[in-house]
Amino acid sequence: MKCELLAEHNLALMLDFVDDENTKYDEAVLKAFLNEKNAYGYIAVDNGKAIGFAYGYVLNEPDGQKVYYLHAIDVVEGWQNQGYGTELVRFIHKHSKTLGCRKMFLHTYKHNASACRCYEKAGGICNAASDDIVFVFK
């Protein structure tokens, strides 16, 4: 398995990728995403097949520092709980450092034990005492 930045050369792999919400990806939309400033996509590939996908954004803070927000990560069922997600998160974290980000953050649910394990194994620190609540508007 290898992790890569999503780019023109591996874009076709995403057209067959189906995430846990059965999202189908459109080539034109993916190309537009690649052209967005501060937006990054990542792909995990095993035997020529996309088995994981993630994306996030560099956020500029008012003090001039940058942080990386990992918005979504998904590993195809059948490849989950085998370390692929952990490797993808490590790859993204390393990439965020090359972009000059002082930290990377993400949101997940406390009851999502497998995701929490993945992020902890990748080096993330869970602030279990935090009283943060994430509101989602659809």
What are these regions (language model features)?
Residues W79, G83-F91:
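Conserved acetyl-CoA pyrophosphate-binding loop and the N-cap/start of the following alpha-helix
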Residues T86, K110-I133, F137:
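Conserved active-site alpha-helix within GNAT-family acetyltransferase domains
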Residues M1-Q65, H71, V89-R90, D132:
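Acetyl-CoA-dependent GNAT
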Residues S96-H107:
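Conserved GNAT acetyl-CoA-binding A-motif
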Residues Y69, D74, F105-H107:
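Conserved beta-strand segments that form the floor/walls of ligand-binding pockets within enzyme
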Residues V76-G78, Q82, K110-H111:
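Active-site acidic-Proline motif in GNAT/NAT acetyltransferases
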